[in-house]
Amino acid sequence: MESQRNLILIGLLFVSFLLWQQWESDKAPKPAPTTVAQTEHFVPEAGQTGDIPQVSEQANANTARKLITVSSDVLKLTLDTQGGDIVSADLLAHKLEEGKDQPFVLLTSQPEHLYVAQSGLVGRNGPDSQAQGRPTYEAAQTSYQLADGQDQVVVPMTWTDSKGVVFTKEFVLKRGDYAVGVDYKIDNKSAEPVQVQFYGQLKQTVTTPKDQQGHAMVASAYRGGAFSSEDTRYKKYTFDEMKDADLNKTTKGGWVAMLQHYFVSAWAPNADDTNSFYSRVIPGKDQAIIGYKAPLVDVAAGQQAEVTSKLWVGPKLQDQMAKVANHLDLTVDYGWLWFIAQPLHWLLTVFHGFVQNWGVAIIMLTLLVRGIMFPLTKAQYTSMAKMRMLQPKLAALRERFGDDRQKMSQGMMELYKKEKVNPLGGCLPILVQMPIFIALYWALMESVELRHAPFALWITDLSVKDPFFVLPILMGASMWYLQKMSPTTITDPMQQKVMQFMPIIFTFMFLWFPAGLTLYWLVSNVISITQQTIIYRQLEKKGLHTRS
């Protein structure tokens, strides 16, 4: 096993990994877009079953609907008094484009890409039930702002039914928090008992917006639904799956969500409640819904009751999301190597806490990872050197046994045993290192902290490609130099040509990779060159040849 062959193996494994991810990525279908009016809403009917019939989408009476804005230090929400839905969510701490002032818009009521968070009360007496239609709430103000010195801002909206039952819907925004409280207070001033059921759902256009489609050379981030239940910590539920079969699951606690790269919106019911999860693709429209229904609530005449829920609408911040609901942090999807990627992300965060630069933190993490793997690297090159020393004896065996493959294999095994050489010793370390690299790949790809994070000089955003392609070119040059300094006994012309083009192929691939990932690979190559130089000197002192 020569280092060139190992480089080929790394390249093939890595390219295969990317191709597999691209093949497995859940891409949404692309039907013709449908223009949708902002007043259209889909609301579930009450009950504990999974049936979700469509109900009235009209507001009560002829009262004029209004849009109310509420802002904290990290969120700006727009609320529609018809139904009390969140029809817009601006993430004030995250800009749409690097260097610009316009905030990133996660929720929007724009017809070309509708994405809203809806909630209400259905049931026998629910204001959003089929018999009632959607209510139009009243609010004292049209604008609410978290003031200096305040920890939270509350937006109360009220509606009173024909029997005198007062429904107050409150939105609670806390300082520095992307979890929005959505609560109902029910004051039954009527002479009859009232029964209601809370629902919360996310409604989104299925077709992927152009700004989320990514590049063909980079594995696409998942966009679609997801949920967590008692027996399933984290499960994606794609738009295609919603088309094939509606989600119908009853569970204690849990959450339902819509995911995209870096950001997520998720309804988190009370952990002690038994909730019903559902999904639906609206017939004839390019829209999908995922949501939940809470247990029925009975309010006796003259009594009061309160129903609470949480809506996360923001970036994928693992530490904060874990406090909102169990396993909500798993929406930062590291794939099947999550158990490696999570510690790597934690280390990256720790390093950033010291240096306050994500690029430098990546370099520090690379140094640590390659340092830990140094014994494997040394074992790899030592095994390669021992195999090289056996080349004359292996050539003699080939000459001795000719085309007799059975005797040739037997002779080689006896030689390896006698010389205490593991023929796979140069390959196994590579196979051990690949899962670490793949996990680190996803740790960097999924980290919202790297979005718009500067490094140095021209690298102002580690989450996108190098605008001048300097890092990919340097990475390719370092790979070429590493290849040149490595010994070779490859005589097959095809393998030689493949080896010559490997740095070019990798350079081309990395032109579109995030600068943070390219930085990791470049630093890793430089470390490999340094380690290889040190190891070769040590081996030569022991009489093991490192050059052919």
UniProtKB/Swiss-Prot annotation:
CDD domains reported for this sequence: 5TM_YidC_Alb3, EcYidC-like_peri
Family under the similarity heading: Belongs to the OXA1/ALB3/YidC family. Type 1 subfamily.
Cited Pfam families: 60KD_IMP, YidC_periplas
HAMAP family named among the record's database cross-references: YidC_type1
Organism (species): Aeromonas hydrophila subsp. hydrophila (strain ATCC 7966 / DSM 30187 / BCRC 13018 / CCUG 14551 / JCM 1027 / KCTC 2358 / NCIMB 9240 / NCTC 8049)
PANTHER family reported in the protein's UniProt record: CYTOCHROME C OXIDASE ASSEMBLY PROTEIN COX18, MITOCHONDRIAL, OXA1
Lineage: Bacteria, Pseudomonadati, Pseudomonadota, Gammaproteobacteria, Aeromonadales
This protein's UniProt keywords: Cell inner membrane, Cell membrane, Chaperone, Membrane, Protein transport, Transmembrane, Transmembrane helix, Transport
GO terms, molecular function: membrane insertase activity
Topology relative to the membrane: Multi-pass membrane protein
Segments traversing the membrane: 6-26, 357-377, 424-444, 455-475, 503-523
Principal subcellular localization: membrane
Top-level taxon: Bacteria
Localization in the cell: Cell inner membrane
Protein name: Membrane protein insertase YidC
